[in-house]
């Protein structure tokens, strides 16, 4: 976890009774303001739905709550910067999927460069540290039209909050388990491999990677969009640029939340990004959706950023489209370098917002730009990191868009292989700003000894770890790369599979042990665990080596 905060009580000694009384009244008012709920149950179900909630991939099960946006804004009027303060007196409540309000200690975590943030003070991004659930982390964006939020959980599914009514009063709270859509997204990024560098470091378990350096890396993000994207959010000219920046901010709040957690990386949108936001399709420098998403946007974006922004003025460039159903990073691991401004993401359903767009698509393509290859094994790209069965389930997989899906959506974290690739790539990068963070001690981790066990025998892996800065979470992942023949139907977990991935990744938990297969499968006396379309766990009935 990147940020760990401690609560501190304010202790003041007042010499005069008058000052004591005034201060006491202030504390009473502050407590009342923060305890007064911003949320209420929905009593009237007669309201128009937001465009985002009408997408096919929107969950079927969710909780709806009504938000008093003005009251929330008042509570957030003075929030400390997380990099300048270790404590905050701002506490707000956020509903979970059961409708229960949970308290979070709030800090500002802007996605804008200071100049851009000063120009648009009404668009904000926050991080919250759980009080009632001490392992919960909130990432929330705020703009004049409402909020979007993402809550990282431990031992249960992560949660999302998105506008459900068109007027931004009613919100849907749902988990990250979503239905599979019928409009596939295709990532056409060529897997130019960092495999050589990865292989050089393979097996060097004692080597300390960049993530242990106690530094947050901040990159300057030049974010552009096609006119269709701006129009989707109601912006038809430059006077409405705030509508587009609010959408940028909502997406990057979630993307940065994941990148900070897994990579200790943050991206700030540059002030001049407003110069590459377009409003009229006839005059923007980008091809129509079908052609652009087919690959034309790579070169068009790079040319636009070079001429309008200047290569010295950004570290990573990306384009948001609104249709076409494709993504392409342009290159892999090229932040700071040639080709750094050629990545794009565009949905197939005409809805460039929401959890699917943010996590499954944008985080995936930006993951490529920072150095991560695909981790699925339904096809083999020779990168050395096809370590997940079938579609995979982590961000660099293809969950929900293949014919061999582990599940219908990506989980909002990166596989170990992706983290290793990105951290390896970051060691040679000089363009980011480096900021020391409070969490200075890397966890001490021991995965245990190697074992030989009988075939078809269930087993448990238990590690040990300690960290003086806070509570740890644990995620066991298999790290065996798929062979050339272990694709398509052979990418599924199988008891006779002699090599390659046979165990899917599951969300991090608070305990250091994992059952193989899942305890439910063991109780059912089954050697396999079924996923959405394939088996995702299988006890080997043949001799083989497994690496975790």
Residue ranges: model-predicted function:
Residues 34-166, 297:
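N-terminal prosegments of processed precursors
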Residues 1-38:
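Bacterial Sec-dependent N-terminal signal peptides
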Residues 447, 451-459:
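Short, solvent-exposed loop/linker segments at the N-terminal edge
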């Amino acid at each position: 976890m990147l940020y760990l905060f401690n609560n501190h009580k304010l202790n003041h000694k007042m010499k005069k009774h008058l000052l004591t009384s005034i201060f006491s009244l202030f504390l009473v008012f502050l407590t009342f303001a923060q305890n007064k709920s911003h949320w209420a149950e929905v009593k009237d179900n007669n309201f128009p739905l937001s465009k985002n909630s009408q997408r096919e991939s929107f969950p079927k099960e969710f909780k709806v709550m009504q938000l008093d946006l003005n009251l929330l804004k008042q509570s957030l009027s003075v929030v400390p910067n997380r990099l300048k303060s270790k404590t905050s007196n701002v506490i707000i409540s956020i509903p979970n999927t059961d409708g229960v309000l949970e308290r979070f200690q709030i800090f500002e975590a802007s996605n804008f460069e200071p100049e851009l943030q000063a120009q648009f003070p009404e668009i904000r991004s926050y991080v919250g540290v759980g009080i009632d659930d001490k392992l919960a982390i909130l990432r929330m964006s705020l703009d004049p039209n409402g909020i979007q939020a993402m809550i990282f959980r431990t031992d249960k599914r992560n949660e999302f909050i998105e506008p459900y009514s068109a007027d931004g009063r009613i919100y849907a709270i749902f988990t990250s388990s979503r239905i599979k859509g019928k409009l596939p997204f295709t990532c056409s990024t060529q897997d130019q491999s960092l495999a050589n560098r990865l292989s050089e470091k393979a097996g060097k378990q004692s080597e300390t990677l960049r993530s242990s350096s106690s530094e947050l890396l901040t990159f300057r993000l030049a974010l552009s969009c096609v006119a269709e994207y701006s129009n989707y959010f109601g912006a038809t000219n430059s006077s409405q640029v705030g509508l587009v920046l609010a959408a940028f901010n909502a997406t990057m709040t979630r993307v940065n939340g994941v990148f900070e957690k897994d990579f200790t990386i943050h991206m700030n949108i540059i002030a001049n990004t407003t110069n590459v936001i377009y409003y009229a399709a006839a005059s923007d420098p980008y091809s129509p959706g079908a052609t652009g998403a087919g690959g034309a946007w790579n070169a068009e974006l790079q040319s636009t950023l070079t001429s309008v922004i200047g290569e010295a003025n950004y570290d990573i460039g990306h384009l948001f489209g609104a249709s076409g159903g494709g993504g392409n990073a342009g290159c892999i691991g090229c932040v700071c370098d040639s080709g750094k401004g050629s990545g794009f993401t565009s949905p197939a359903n005409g809805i460039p917002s929401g959890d699917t767009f943010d996590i499954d698509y944008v985080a995936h393509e930006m993951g490529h730009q920072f150095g991560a290859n695909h981790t699925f094994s339904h096809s083999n790209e020779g990168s050395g990191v096809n370590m997940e069965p079938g579609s995979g389930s982590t961000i660099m997989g293809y969950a929900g868009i293949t014919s061999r899906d582990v599940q219908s959506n990506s989980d909002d974290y990166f596989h170990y292989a992706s983290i290793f690739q990105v951290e390896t790539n970051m060691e040679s990068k000089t363009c980011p700003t480096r900021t020391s963070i409070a969490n200075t001690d890397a966890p001490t981790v021991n995965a245990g000894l190697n074992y030989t066990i009988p075939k078809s025998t269930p087993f448990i892996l238990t590690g040990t770890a300690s960290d003086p800065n806070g509570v740890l979470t644990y995620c066991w992942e298999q790290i065996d790369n798929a062979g050339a023949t272990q694709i398509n139907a052979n990418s599924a977990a199988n008891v006779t599979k002699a090599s390659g991935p046979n165990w899917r990744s599951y969300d991090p938990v608070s305990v250091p042990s994992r059952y193989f297969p899942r305890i439910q499968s063991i109780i059912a006396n089954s050697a396999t665990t079924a996923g959405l379309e394939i088996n995702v766990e299988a006890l080997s009935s043949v001799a083989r080596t497994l690496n975790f």
